[in-house]
Amino acid sequence: MFYPDPFDVIIIGGGHAGTEAAMAAARMGQQTLLLTHNIDTLGQMSCNPAIGGIGKGHLVKEVDALGGLMAKAIDQAGIQFRILNASKGPAVRATRAQADRVLYRQAVRTALENQPNLMIFQQAVEDLIVENDRVVGAVTQMGLKFRAKAVVLTVGTFLDGKIHIGLDNYSGGRAGDPPSIPLSRRLRELPLRVGRLKTGTPPRIDARTIDFSVLAQQHGGNPMPVFSFMGNASQHPQQVPCYITHTNEKTHDVIRSNLDRSPMYAGVIEGVGPRYCPSIEDKVMRFADRNQHQIFLEPEGLTSNEIYPNGISTSLPFDVQMQIVRSMQGMENAKIVRPGYAIEYDFFDPRDLKPTLESKFIQGLFFAGQINGTTGYEEAAAQGLLAGLNAARLSADKEGWAPARSQAYLGVLVDDLCTLGTKEPYRMFTSRAEYRLMLREDNADLRLTEIGRELGLVDDERWARFNEKLENIERERQRLKSTWVTPSAEAAAEVNAHLTAPLSREASGEDLLRRPEMTYEKLTTLTPFAPALTDEQAAEQVEIQVKYEGYIARQQDEIEKQLRNENTLLPATLDYRQVSGLSNEVIAKLNDHKPASIGQASRISGVTPAAISILLVWLKKQGMLRRSA
């Protein structure tokens, strides 16, 4: 039977991608249905209990700047907050928070249940309704059919998921959850390229069996950072430390002597694992010269005794896992409460997607999260928001939107996936972005909130706060530009006490702030330049904008040059065999990828600058050279 009411957008899956997709579509006023196999696991952290990190924290801030959920949820659930790379420049500083799994899940579910235009329904999906190469609905395991104008697939590791512990394996979407086998079969029938990937998780340890007295503590930052531009530190629950232990030669001997029982090394697992989150087996074998590896013991929550040992992801048999755990300092009597495991699952080649994350072959069908070959909650959330907003726009007969590489890490993520594809789980790093100085955590709202407002993602409260911040930045910069001190002025001695070289000529507040030894905090304690802004976010922007003004202007010039190529569009139906002068390799790659622009074509492996020049000349001769607005 068909459900009596039609929907604009259906989201399949309630993980980090699915929840952001559902919230985005509903915020934009579209009637949205979130289908999940279990309402109690909405927003579940399947692996490590943490949000953020290098590159990842940037994505969370961008999701927040566009009105998303993740940053608000972690502000209510984070039990240890830190700034990584705090001593480095603002481009690579990143926020990370340890999470209480239960509080995080509660925050996500509460937000979903209070979101207008959103209905949640518990049933596994087994089929899609496709008519004339367009998706028009979904079918659940009890045969109930839902109609919609767009469908977003955010199914994580559930598609034909297979869990491995030692040489034993069984079907599962994650520990304790069933896989989605019928949906996997259905998707394999569609004209989509499919592959297998693998990820893993470590055993969980009973905290009561660990001797923390012999371990080093790791505390959070002070003052405590905040993830959401709308948040404050008073929202954070009780803060707790993490602990550090290490593997040793005994640990490594145990692993080496049991490699024949590892599903990876025995050839049982065919999927490729994440390069930047390797299993402990991989670390021991790949870095054979290392006699130890650092392991972080991270609490899973304020009401849980479980500890997540970050760094020993493994699929070795349970008896070997016990030996590994008990070989480390402080863990000699430790008990495992959940075994570690590896999981293999289907993913679909993201090169078959438009930058909006809509399929090139099935109209109205969007993909987000691990199904696209990524790893990580943050990467999933960012894709979910983008897919959700574009599904909503499609259902309202509006053009899709995707950020450029120069606009957001989300733009880098999507462009990398859609242009280059991936053969291993893709993780975001700051090093993947060409324009890191422009794409900082601290200015995510300045880059994206106005766009989010135009798209219908940003509510009145956030918009008012954003405009107040803009006014504070502009007013303070004008004040510092117009406030001067001369070498002969009475205040000069007070200013000189904070400088490595005394004033030799008249200087404005901005001139002084550009000096390496001067900070905004110091400057605004000096008589001519007091008082400081009470808006800490605006104060941070003033300092960064002034200190890095020259570098930022230079990078903006680079972006404008790059945009000329990025905005030169390529016809979707162009057969590159028509372009004389291109090599067979370049023709094959361009016909395979079907890039949307010259900029995208230039990032395809094997497409040379010479080939791009030939293509530009040919387009001009054919009268096909056109640029987007």
Swiss-Prot record:
Principal localisation: cytoplasm
Pfam families recorded: GIDA, GIDA_C_1st, SAM_GIDA_C
Chain residues that bind NAD(+): 273-287
Cofactor(s) in the UniProt record: FAD
Residues that, per the record, bind FAD: G13, G14, G15, H16, A17, G18, V125, S180, Q370
Gene Ontology CC: one annotated term: cytosol
UniProt keyword annotations, A-Z: Cytoplasm, FAD, Flavoprotein, NAD, tRNA processing
NCBIfam families xrefs: mnmG_gidA (TIGR00136)
Subunit structure: Homodimer. Heterotetramer of two MnmE and two MnmG subunits.
Family designation: Belongs to the MnmG family.
Cited function: NAD-binding protein involved in the addition of a carboxymethylaminomethyl (cmnm) group at the wobble position (U34) of certain tRNAs, forming tRNA-cmnm(5)s(2)U34.
Official protein name in the record: tRNA uridine 5-carboxymethylaminomethyl modification enzyme MnmG
Provenance organism: Shigella boydii serotype 18 (strain CDC 3083-94 / BS512)
